[in-house]
Amino acid sequence: MSGKSKKVKGTKQTLEYVEQPEKLHVKAIKCKNAKQKEFLKTLDEKIITVCTGSPGSGKTLLALYSALKALEKGQIECIYLVKPVVQIPGEEVGFLRGSLEEKLDPVNWSFYGNLDKLIGESWRKKLMAEKKIISVPIAFLRGVNLDHARVIVDEA
């Protein structure tokens, strides 16, 4: 990260800060094939879209891109990120301390990596702090009003 330094008057302290654009800007992506184009079009046109594909085919990246573009345009107010939190036998991690967000962090690393590609780490953290991007276990969505939101259920 490149930042600027600013000397604080009356002290020997120098603060580092990173300039961040005021408005969300989602990096443009280019679909690699016709199926990706069709998936992206379906995400923008349909209320519910179900997609299957091999690992690395762009399902998560395209779903996040579509949701971020809708957020950028003001078409939605927030994005819910949902992944199963069920442990796979033989891959148990045991009890995790901390808040719900801290417990879900390891599960959401693939979301975070893709979000960082599209908007950068600082914007991801900003939108998460503002509850514009919300990570939640699916069980916690019961009774939640999803008007003006995009829900991405990954690896279900």
Please give the residue ranges for each predicted region.
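Conserved adenine-nucleotide phosphate-binding loops and their immediately adjacent elements
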Residues: 18-28
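A generic local structural motif
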Residues: 36-38, 120-122, 135-140
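Residue-level signature of catalytic and energy-coupling elements of molecular machines
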Residues: 43, 79, 154
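Pre-Walker A (Motif I) flank of P-loop NTPase domains
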Residues: 45-51, 148
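Conserved RecA-like ASCE ATPase "motif II neighborhood" in helicase/translocase motors
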Residues: 129-156
